[in-house]
C-alpha cells in the first residue's frame, strides 16, 4: 500500500474511520461499508451523482475513465480538487459529499431490489391462484 492511502485516512480521521481495500490496480476507500472514493495511481477520485456532480463540473474536474474494448468508460468517481490536500476541513466536506452520494446510490439500489422482489412475488401469487 502506498503512503497515499494512510495519508488520506489521517486527513479524514476527524470525519470518520476510513478503510481501504485493493481493487483493479488501485484501492477503494470505504466508510461504514460503502465505497466513497477510489485511489488510482496516487490520484483520488470521489463518488459523484446528480446531486454533487455539478460542483465537480464547476471546478473543471473530470471523471475517472478507463479503456475497455477500445472505448473510454467513465465511472461515477470524479477527480478530487487539489485544495482538499491542504485543507482538512475541505477534505472532510468533499469526503462527506462523496459518501452521501454513495449512500444515495446504495439506497436507490436497495429500493429497486425491493420493488423487483415484490413484482416477482406478485407474479408468483397470480400464477398459483390460476392453477
What function would you assign to each model-found segment?
Residues 1-131:
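Charge-dense, helix-prone N-terminal extensions
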Amino acid at each position: 500500500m502506498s503512503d497515499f492511502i494512510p495519508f488520506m485516512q489521517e486527513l479524514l480521521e476527524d470525519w470518520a474511520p476510513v478503510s481501504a481495500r485493493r481493487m483493479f490496480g488501485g484501492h477503494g476507500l470505504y466508510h461504514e461499508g460503502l465505497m466513497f472514493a477510489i485511489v488510482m495511481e496516487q490520484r483520488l477520485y470521489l463518488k459523484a451523482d446528480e446531486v454533487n456532480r455539478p460542483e465537480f463540473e464547476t471546478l473543471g474536474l473530470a471523471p475517472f475513465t478507463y479503456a475497455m474494448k477500445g472505448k473510454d468508460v467513465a465511472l461515477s468517481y470524479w477527480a478530487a480538487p487539489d485544495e482538499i490536500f491542504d485543507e482538512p476541513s475541505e477534505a472532510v466536506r468533499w469526503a462527506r459529499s462523496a459518501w452521501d452520494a454513495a449512500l444515495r446510490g446504495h439506497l436507490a439500489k436497495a429500493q429497486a431490489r425491493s420493488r423487483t422482489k415484490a413484482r416477482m412475488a406478485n407474479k408468483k401469487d397470480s400464477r398459483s391462484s390460476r392453477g
